[in-house]
Regions:
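Glycine/Thr-rich beta-alpha phosphate-binding loop at enzyme active sites
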Residues: 44-60, 194-207, 241, 245-302
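Glycine-rich beta-to-alpha transition loops that act as phosphate-gripper elements at the mouths
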Residues: 82-85, 232-238, 305-316
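Catalytic cores of alpha/beta
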Residues: 89-94, 236-248, 312-329
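Glycine-rich phosphate-binding active-site loops on the catalytic face of alpha/beta enzymes
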Residues: 103-112, 191-193, 255-263, 318-345
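A gly/proline- and charged-residue-enriched helix-loop-helix capping module
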Residues: 105, 110-155
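C-terminal helical cap(s) of enzyme catalytic domains, especially alpha/beta-barrels
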Residues: 112-127, 267-278, 336-359
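Alpha-helix-loop-beta-strand connector modules within alpha/beta enzyme cores
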Residues: 128, 138-153, 205-225, 277-304, ...
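Active-site glycine- and acidic-residue-rich loops that bind
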Residues: 162-174, 201, 230-249
């Protein structure tokens, strides 16, 4: 591995680029024989070694994907979802494989281990994951110091949540919000993980109103302008959507992420791990999350950006969410199954789709399937 890292520039010249991409297909079975969390740790270490030059992931004609999000220009609307770089260790290295933006976290006020292991399960036959991690991270103070010492090179979101043992979840959100006000580009209020008991109660109107009103209070007192997003569960009832949208607009939330992992939707799964408890991500929730994008877009009428996440692993699946109303998309499970070249492939395919449909910029496609 160290020898490969030293010689990486030679390996990535000319036709050897194809050899390296092929190499990942050989490495994948070895990685998938590892425990999922050990494989994740290996991926983080690989990014720290910075052995993949950014030139490998450049795409011709990417200008058609240029957009802006929360006041910042980005090269493309493909983002890495929260959950991969939980404690802000490698976000700048992740940008180098082509992501337009990265979201770190979920970060809690205090460091915590999370739930007992094993807690991550691959569903290879379903191209999915089930996790019950429980917000394992290094804590807000450590994460803030890392970001301050390593200025983000592109749009960085910070996903926040409460500690498992807290006696006041709202206060935990407020603590994290105040800590991260001065850094990053946006803060995501994560009320949708199925792995922290009581967290999804914030989808109830009274609980959500109380939380958002207090977030607004500290935002108004702060000297820092910061965009706030809300990350929503895919296990909502349709009857809850209008109430949530009204509160989002009332309290001037700047964006919404649709959706987190699902506690349901197991009927079509065939993998042996499909019975595990936890949040389901990947292909099995692709249509579900896209439908939520469509429903929220209609309710919001384009007033704030939607970030679509859930089953994005190709240019086609990215375009489906954008056409349904997403201004940008995120992925995570697709990266696990397809490797670091997935971002380049999505961008190449997305460029071709846009051109074939007569769009001159990605923004023209947002909500196009509804117009």
């Amino acid at each position: 591995y160290k020898l490969f890292w030293r010689q990486r520039d030679n390996w990535f010249n000319g036709k050897k680029v194809e050899n390296i991409i092929l190499m990942f297909s050989f490495i994948r079975p070895f990685i998938f024989n590892l425990d999922p969390e050990k494989a994740h740790d290996l991926a983080i270490k690989s990014f720290k070694y910075n052995f993949l030059p950014s030139s490998l992931f450049s795409v011709q004609g990417e200008e058609i994907l240029n957009t802006s999000l929360f006041g910042k220009e980005i090269s493309n609307p493909i983002g890495l979802a929260a959950g991969f770089d939980k404690s802000a260790e490698v976000y700048n290295e992740i940008f180098k494989i082509g992501f337009g933006f990265v979201e770190i976290g979920t970060v809690t006020p205090k460091q915590q281990f999370g739930n007992e292991k094993p807690r991550v399960f691959r569903l290879e036959k379903d191209q999915a994951l089930i996790n019950r991690l429980g917000f394992n991270n290094d804590g807000s103070d450590v994460v803030r110091k890392r970001i301050e010492a390593n200025i983000p090179s592109n749009l960085l979101g910070i996903n926040i949540g409460p500690n498992k043992d807290t006696d006041n979840m709202t206060n935990d959100f407020l603590k994290c919000a105040e800590i991260f006000f001065p850094i990053g580009d946006y803060i995501t209020i994560n009320i949708s993980s199925p792995n922290t008991k009581g967290l999804r109660d914030f989808h109830n109107e009274d609980d959500l109103k109380n939380l958002l009103s207090k977030i607004n209070e500290i935002r108004e007192k702060s000297n820092f302008k910061k965009s706030f997003l809300l990350k929503i569960s895919p296990d909502l009832e349709d009857s809850q959507i209008s109430g949530i949208v009204n509160l989002i607009l009332e309290y001037k939330i700047d964006g919404i992420i649709l959706t987190n992992t699902s506690n349901k939707n197991r009927e079509s799964l065939i993998d042996v791990n499909s019975k595990e408890i936890g949040g389901l991500s990947g292909k099995p929730i692709k249509e579900l999350s896209t439908e939520f994008v469509r429903k929220f877009y209609k309710e919001l009428n384009g007033k704030i950006p939607i970030i679509g996440v859930g089953g994005v692993d190709s240019g086609e699946s990215a375009f489906e969410k954008i056409a349904a109303g997403a201004s940008a998309v995120q992925l995570y499970t697709g990266l696990i199954y397809k490797g670091p070249n997935i971002v380049k492939e999505i961008k190449k395919d997305l460029i071709q789709i846009l051109k074939s449909k007569g769009f001159t910029n990605i923004n023209e496609a947002v909500g196009s399937s509804l117009n």
